[in-house]
């Protein structure tokens, strides 16, 4: 079964290379088989991840308990910084990619769900979302930092990953 899944992943990855945007990255196949995303896909996903982290954490600053607010403030500060760093790489011409203007549909759905919650329900969902978002971000940054095709972006991803790993550990601790 595992071999069939991996073979299917390779087939999707190969087929998707003929199209502009990577279906393999969108569907998670690249993550499953450990393949680095294309530069454009990495920029899109990293920027959208920052947007989600900032928006959801600003909401947590309004609705959460003190421990969660402390975490949320760090997320806002850190992700605003990484967002600016990524923008500088792209606008400075070191990375040939287009920054997205909005987060993904799934991130919008997660944020919409959070906006409908209050109290303990909000806190539990925010903690779970943060853990999931940081697991995905760590994986994305690891894959690009290890095997990305743009040297400047690859170095930035590798430099940024330890902070994301720390965020993940913090999110896991909050989620207990």
Put a short name on every predicted segment:
Residues 2-9, 16-176:
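His/Met- and acidic-residue-enriched segments that coordinate or traffic transition-metal cofactors
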